[in-house]
Design a protein with these regions (language model features):
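Conserved catalytic core of nucleic-acid polymerases
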Residues: 468, 582, 587-590, 666-799, ...
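C-terminal polymerase-core module
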Residues: 487-494, 498, 502-551, 720-768, ...
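Non-catalytic, usually N-terminal nucleic-acid engagement modules in DNA/RNA processing proteins
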Residues: 1-54, 58, 65
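Function-dense linear segments that define catalytic or interfacial modules
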Residues: 332-335, 405-426, 431, 587-672
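Extended two-metal-dependent nuclease catalytic cores across DNA- and RNA-processing enzymes
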Residues: 23-24, 74-247
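Conserved beta-strand -> loop -> alpha-helix junction used to position metal-binding or nucleic-acid-contacting
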Residues: 6-11, 128-129, 134-159, 389-407, ...
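Conserved "right-hand" nucleotidyltransferase catalytic core of DNA-directed polymerases
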Residues: 228-349, 367, 371, 431-610, ...
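Conserved DEDDh/DEDDy metal-dependent 3′-5′ exonuclease domain
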Residues: 52-54, 105-106, 129, 301-444
Length: 855
């Protein structure tokens, strides 16, 4: 039976820090916490013998709990100065060991652990010093709680849990809701301690039941409960681990490989961990054949190159690994020698200037060369930005191969990859060569070579060109918007101060706002924390109808976010010379194959509201003789659903250009097409799109504001009307359960381990993924093929217009007026014919001087 160990990194390193005596290296680096953690780690390995291990860490950024409750963890003492630098040090050691390290902004280590534990069906062991994790105990999950130091550990299983606690695991949340938790500053019900809380839970089981029967409870306790009802429910939310926080749950990425690479032993020597350094059984002392997971220093030679003549004996046509860093360029020809071109940082250092170093390897970046790199787009960016050089070699991209083989998504650096596969970080070119050899074989086995060679690899070049092209921003419009929003904010602040009867009120101060709302205006009771009353969005939205000041505060925050995130947020990203924004496209992040972007994230701009429209008006064509052309797929996922399910009524409706939503409404509501109301059509549209995502009756009811029963009837009638769709969705789930993954029209795979979970909600989530992945992933495949085709047509027809942006199902071209008609024709032809289906793909074209006008 396979075993998975999940470790709360922050919790255990904290325990180790206080359990171990002070340890410093000769350079004064504190290491006691890392040393203690490593001892616990190796003890765990010998006792549990896990197949998979992951260590989760908190990030410094506020979590969703801080946003929910300002006082969350507010009473925590600052981290000791000697502990703070040991956390990144521990992460470095773990990554060298090839141990999976997880962290996620907005979530805590508990949430990461809970998500992985609940989305896998492997016997799981959680190591933590935080009792919150006890709520995760079930038939497949055991919690090892570190009570004191690093050796006093208590085991909690589903069999001994009630005996140890008098509760069932889920009641840990209920307990904290009632009695609070001083360590996390969870308030609970004031005046209710552990004994009283346990008594209540023995009788009523849950907080909800306590309040349902609060009339039975007598005296002061009843008063305390009634007075603190909102606080109890808030505390329950704060204490509940988020088991769906969005981290990668593919355990293949957590496989533990022992013994560990010699790089770990070298790190232990550097940290002066003599006992661990001398434990020879921990390390791989043998040389492994090429393609293995490690290679001893004795086997691979590193040779410093003094001139390009030394490399001239190697044919550039032979597949070669090449890596660029700030300190060196390394190249590996498959001969057991990694050639190194050192780059000096100052004139006094040994080595070459960057341009001199590049001249030595330049031959391997030009046409005719066959190379392997990690992230081709980044290599091209480095050469262009730092050396004004073009990268024209025929390049294989290890980052893309890894992405397609694992298809888990999530950004990965070369260092992460080397750690994952147990390679020396000091031999990057050799590691790239060897890992590529392993993964390309897997790529072929999985039938993904066409997707890699015909889509992802050429798309990398298209994205590079789009990043270079950039998007023109009307700086005048941006400044006008900035002034406009500043005026709106100023006006809102005046209104708020007038209603508060306080001309000096700082509207941006939660403390001052809280005092005005809850003490002066007496709007509700408010929850006072150490730093003042909570004025979070949840709190204010609950008070919106209570006083005219509340919606003004919410509006102020909305405009302020718009101002800071987009208007002011764009300004530092605009190239001062050209006035262009150059977003960066992420090709290997999402599990579905969709692209994302950053700096700025142009895919997150609101689409339908007025604010989003205002932002789009700021993006303009590059000159008076240019326009923006937007080409947007119409209902692409619904069209794919129709084709894949072979649903003739839907296929006929789409191919005839009829209103699919109106026809669906007519059938679901059993009325003639002529009698379909706008409300019926909206509801049918929600059903059509909801089906794609495996929507529940509850989700549909919430969307269209109806009862669960009515929503259930709509879904039932829909599937009776379109039985082919129901059969297709069921087949998607069956296929995924049988094979462990779903796949797209181009055979892109997404592995869905949630389908094997013993937890019903987790399995349901897996089923929804299985239903949706073939549609959402195929949509990504289609637009990627279209992007390549459009780019190739623009080049082959010698046009000057440029493809500049992809957002969801939309492509944007900055086109010359003289090329407007031909670009429109190219977009329509290439996008609508990207794949051959029974259903016509339709593209809606818009033209304008701004993105808003074109959209």
């Amino acid at each position: 039976m396979e075993k998975l160990v999940l470790i709360d990194g922050n919790s255990l390193i904290n325990r180790a820090f206080y359990a171990m005596p002070v340890l410093l290296t000769k350079d004064g680096v504190p290491t006691n916490a890392v040393y203690g953690f490593m001892n616990m780690f190796f003890k765990m390995l010998s006792e549990v013998k896990p197949d998979y291990v992951a260590v989760a860490f908190d990030l410094k950024a506020p979590t969703f709990r801080h946003k929910m409750y300002d006082g969350y963890k507010a009473t925590r003492k600052p981290m000791p100065d000697d502990l703070r630098p040991q956390i990144p040090l521990l992460k470095e050691v773990l990554k060298l060991m090839g141990v999976a390290v997880y962290e996620k902004e907005g979530s805590e280590a508990d949430d990461i652990i809970g998500t992985i534990a609940k989305h896998t069906s492997i016997q799981t062991y959680i190591y933590t010093g935080d009792k919150d994790a006890l709520q995760l105990v079930d038939g497949e999950t055991t919690v090892y709680f570190t009570r004191r130091g690093i050796t006093d550990i208590e085991e909690y299983t589903i069999n001994n849990f009630t005996e140890k606690t008098t509760l069932v695991p889920s009641q840990i949340i209920e307990l904290k809701a009632l009695m609070g938790d001083s360590s996390d500053n969870i308030p609970g019900v004031k005046g209710v301690g552990e004994k009283t809380a346990l008594t209540l839970l023995q009788e009523y089981k849950t907080v909800e039941n306590v309040y349902k029967n609060v009339g039975e409870i007598k005296g002061k306790l009843q008063e305390k409960l009634i007075e603190n009802e909102q606080t109890a429910y808030l505390s329950k939310k704060l204490a509940t681990i988020d088991t769906d926080c969005g981290v990668d749950t593919n355990v293949d990425n957590m496989r533990i490989k022992t013994p560990f690479p010699l790089a770990v032993k070298e790190k232990f020597r550097e940290l002066e961990f003599k006992t661990l350094f001398n434990r020879e059984e921990l390390f791989d002392q043998t040389s492994v054949e090429e393609g293995g997971n490690d290679y001893s220093l004795e086997k691979i030679e590193r040779k410093t190159v003094a001139s390009k003549e030394e490399l001239s004996v190697f044919s550039k046509e032979k597949l070669t690994a090449l890596n660029f860093s700030s300190s060196e360029i390394t190249i590996y020809f498959g001969t057991g020698v990694e050639y190194v071109v050192p780059i000096r940082k100052t004139l006094l250092d040994d080595g070459f200037s960057l341009s001199e170093a590049f001249e030595i390897v330049k031959e391997y970046t030009t046409s005719g060369a066959n190379v392997i790199v990690f992230n081709k787009k980044d290599v091209k960016r480095f050469l262009l930005d730092d050396l004004s050089a073009q990268f024209t070699a025929h390049a294989q991209d290890l980052s893309l191969v890894k992405y397609l083989v694992s298809q888990a998504g999530g950004s990965q650096t070369l260092e992460d990859l080397l750690s994952e596969y147990g390679y020396q970080h000091t031999y990057p070119a050799y590691a790239i060569y060897s890992i590529y050899d392993q993964l390309y074989k897997k790529l072929k086995e999985d039938g993904l070579t066409s997707l890699y060679e015909e889509v992802e690899l050429p798309l990398s070049d298209v994205l590079f060109e789009m990043e270079n092209a950039g998007f023109k921003v009307d700086i005048g419009a941006l400044n006008t918007a900035s002034e406009k929003y500043a005026e709106i904010l100023k006006g809102l602040e005046s209104e708020i101060r007038a209603l508060a009867e306080n001309e000096t009120l700082n509207v941006n101060s939660p403390k001052q706002l809280g005092e005005v709302l809850f003490e002066k205006l007496k709007i509700g009771k408010g929850k006072k924390t150490k730093s003042g009353y909570s004025t979070s969005a949840d709190v204010l939205e609950g008070l919106e109808g209570a006083h005219a000041i509340v919606p003004l505060i919410l509006k102020h925050r909305q405009i302020q976010k718009l101002q800071s995130t987009y208007v002011e947020g764009f300004k530092p990203l605009i190239d001062k010379k050209t006035g262009l924004i150059h977003t960066s496209f992420n090709q290997t992040v999402t599990a579905t194959g969709r692209l994302s972007s950053k700096e700025p994230n142009l895919q997150n701009i609101p689409v339908r509201d007025d604010e989003g429209k205002e932002i789009r008006k700021m993006f303009v064509a590059r000159g008076e003789d240019r326009v923006l052309i937007s080409a947007d797929y119409s209902q692409i996922e619904l069209r794919l659903l129709s084709a894949f399910s072979n649903c003739e009524p839907l296929i006929s409706a789409f191919n005839s250009g009829r209103d699919v939503h109106a026809e669906t409404a007519s059938k679901v509501f059993n009325v003639p097409l002529s009698e379909v109301t706008s409300q019926m059509r909206r509801s049918a549209k929600a059903v059509n799109f909801g089906i794609i995502y495996g929507i529940s009756e509850y989700g549909l009811a919430k969307n269209i504001k109806t009862s669960n029963q009515q929503a259930r009837e709509y879904i039932k009638t829909y599937f009776e009307t379109y039985p082919e769709v129901k059969a297709y969705m069921d087949e998607n789930v069956r296929f995924a359960k049988e094979h462990g993954y779903s796949e797209t029209v181009l055979k892109r795979k997404r592995y869905i381990r949630e389908l094997q979970s013993s937890s019903y909600p987790v399995r349901q989530f897996g089923e929804r993924v299985a239903m949706n992945m073939p549609l959402q992933g195929s949509s990504a495949d289609v637009i990627k093929k279209a992007m390549i085709a459009v780019s190739n047509r623009i080049k082959s027809e010698n046009l000057k217009s440029q493809l500049i942006l992809q957002v969801h199902d939309e492509l944007i071209v900055d086109a010359f007026e003289s090329e407007k008609e031909i670009i429109t024709k190219i977009l329509k032809e290439e996008m609508e014919n990207a794949v051959s289906l029974k259903v016509k793909l339709t593209v809606e074209i818009g033209v304008g001087k701004t993105w808003f006008e074109a959209k």
